[in-house]
């Protein structure tokens, strides 16, 4: 019998590959169909977001942060506002806190929906992609009626939110929740027991609890590996402690476990939204006391000439001379900001801790020894957005 030895082949996937979920490039070394090595190449979408923050006020910087994870922009807005709030010890009214939680959970559902559709398309199932767009469109309609924008909302403000919920919005959102829960069951009936789907995800890309902790993973990646860790429970931020919900987690640590965790999180998010809508208190939607931090306006802005060029000062806040790390549970994991202030309206240092960047580092060990076709399954299960990976 003649045994022929084959040489390894180096293949470049991306950065313009339809399954790369953005401009990501993978340099893959193959031995036939087996993956020997995988090297992610990042930076194609780098825009210097951390440096831009150092010469912008917080309000000026808000439109930039929605370009990190552009599919779940409420989380990036929330962390941008939470950092100076914690540093300056600004209290948020109860109503504003409930509104924030509702918006964050709607954003979590929209993000998980737009993960589920392309993930299924990556492994060969096209139908769910069209189903999820139907429900996601309803969430964007809710965002549009509350904030004026379908994406890039610019809704969060220091000490609260920009505007109160419009008349009839709460009833409209409750109707969506009642409509959406049966749809999650529909997704599961369509996907979970499908034998082709199970063959593609079961036992693929396994990472155990200890490895997940050592790699610094967070979000569904960590919870699918047997770690019951959710910052909404751990850090007690906003009003999550006043609501009844449970952390979704699995022990297997494979692609199927990550799918189950995210589908379960959509259910829990609906439960959180329903409770928050029914318990939302009255009162102000913004802490007007926070305006006391407003720096003095220049007297020349009231001059005669300025009336003709519509010069209007946006509220600027002096960031105290301290340092603080703030984090929250975004749809993809722990989104954090390390903020250093120096008693100026601009941050001295604005360090971003994106969940996608950390979670992506585990891709090479996960795909080593797997088949070429499994790369798309594993990469899809990680759920990355290159806007926040490259920043």
UniProtKB/Swiss-Prot annotation:
Main subcellular localisation: plastid
Q: Which domain of life is it from?
A: Eukaryota
Which Gene3D superfamilies does UniProt cross-reference here?
Answer: Cytochrome-c3 Hydrogenase, chain B (1.10.645.10)
Entry's InterPro entries? NADH_Q_OxRdtase_suD (IPR001135), NADH_UbQ_OxRdtase_49kDa_CS (IPR014029), NDH1_su_D/H (IPR022885), NiFe-Hase_large (IPR029014)
Its GO CC terms? chloroplast thylakoid membrane
According to its UniProt record, this protein's enzyme class is translocase
The UniProt keywords, alphabetically, are:
Chloroplast, Membrane, NAD, NADP, Plastid, Plastoquinone, Quinone, Thylakoid, Translocase, Transport
Topology of this chain in the membrane? Peripheral membrane protein
> Care to name a GO molecular-function term for this sequence?
NAD binding
Which GO terms fall under biological process for this protein?
photosynthesis, light reaction
Annotated EC: 7.1.1.-
- Enzymatic reactions: a plastoquinone + NADH + (n+1) H(+)(in) = a plastoquinol + NAD(+) + n H(+)(out); a plastoquinone + NADPH + (n+1) H(+)(in) = a plastoquinol + NADP(+) + n H(+)(out)
Kindly list the places in or outside the cell where this protein is found, as annotated in its UniProt entry: Plastid, Chloroplast thylakoid membrane
For this protein, the record's SUPFAM superfamilies field holds:
HydB/Nqo4-like (SSF56762)
Asked if Membrane is a keyword of the record, the answer is: yes
| Listed Pfam families | Complex1_49kDa (PF00346)
Family per record: Belongs to the complex I 49 kDa subunit family.
Q: What does this protein do?
A: NDH shuttles electrons from NAD(P)H:plastoquinone, via FMN and iron-sulfur (Fe-S) centers, to quinones in the photosynthetic chain and possibly in a chloroplast respiratory chain. The immediate electron acceptor for the enzyme in this species is believed to be plastoquinone. Couples the redox reaction to proton translocation, and thus conserves the redox energy in a proton gradient.
Q: What is this protein called?
A: NAD(P)H-quinone oxidoreductase subunit H, chloroplastic
